[in-house]
Curated annotation (Swiss-Prot):
CDD domains, per database record: S4
UniProt entry keywords in alphabetical sequence: Ribonucleoprotein, Ribosomal protein, RNA-binding, rRNA-binding
Domain called S4 RNA-binding: residue spans: 99-162
MF terms (GO), sorted A to Z: rRNA binding; structural constituent of ribosome
Organism expressing this protein natively: Leptospira biflexa serovar Patoc (strain Patoc 1 / ATCC 23582 / Paris)
Superkingdom: Bacteria
Gene designation: rpsD
Lineage: Bacteria, Pseudomonadati, Spirochaetota, Spirochaetia, Leptospirales
Family of this protein: Belongs to the universal ribosomal protein uS4 family.
Name of the molecule in the record: Small ribosomal subunit protein uS4
Biological process according to GO: ribosomal small subunit biogenesis; translation
């Protein structure tokens, strides 16, 4: 599956906010880049022009895509499914993204970024209900048990991530985690209130509805 592999700070500068693409320690070192260069990558703009309605819609879409590490084709499929699912399309879209396995690992604290979580999943370090799953977009359901494979439990990455998660209490409220057993469980489906990305999802719906 195609993935963006370039500098993630450029993506955050493009959107003008922290998209949680880097861990807090690394981001702290590069924070000045976001603060001092409050403009998209490239030459400093001579004059900030008025953004069009389409431009605003596009920025909202790109913000969400980049935060969750999803490319256009797959994002479009998520939207189409969300539009045909009972409920509010925009909120359905965000819920589908939150239920991705890579995001759940991040929400549980086993990974410091979604990008790192994708790496763990792709290298088959993750079990779902006792079975290896190497598909980052795997959608979890209530009651699913997520585990770190035994051989990977002693990894320095996992040990450091768990310490950080415990220190800042970053675990999402819709999952439970037992760090001593390197496992967690999905307690409920995420709702709009659980989304910590400042996004206007209705704007994305309007963009795709044209």
């Amino acid at each position: 599956m195609a993935r963006y592999r370039g500098p993630v700070v450029k993506l955050m500068r493009r959107e003008g906010l922290n998209l949680f693409l880097k861990n807090s320690h690394t981001l702290h070192k590069e924070k000045s880049s976001l603060e001092k260069r409050k403009y998209p990558p490239g030459l400093p703009p001579k004059k900030k022009g008025k953004i069009t309605e389409y431009g605003a819609q596009l920025r909202e879409k790109q913000k969400v895509k980049r935060a969750y590490g999803v490319l256009e084709k797959q994002f479009r499929r998520y939207f189409e499914e969300a539009s045909h699912t009972p409920g509010i399309p925009g909120e359905n879209l965000l819920q589908f993204l939150e239920r991705r396995l890579d995001n759940v690992l991040y929400r549980m604290g086993f990974a410091v970024t979604r990008r790192q979580a994708r790496n763990f999943v792709a290298h088959r370090h993750i079990l779902v209900n006792g079975h290896r799953v190497d598909i980052c977009s795997y959608r979890v359901n209530i009651g699913d048990k997520i585990e770190i494979r035994e051989k990977f439990q002693k990894s320095a990455f996992i040990e450091e991530n768990i310490k950080l998660a415990q220190a800042i209490n970053r675990t999402a409220s819709w999952v439970s985690v037992d760090y001593a057993k390197f496992s967690g469980e999905v307690l409920s489906l995420p709702t709009r209130d659980h989304i910590d990305i400042p996004v206007k999802e209705q704007v994305i719906v309007e963009l795709y509805s044209k």
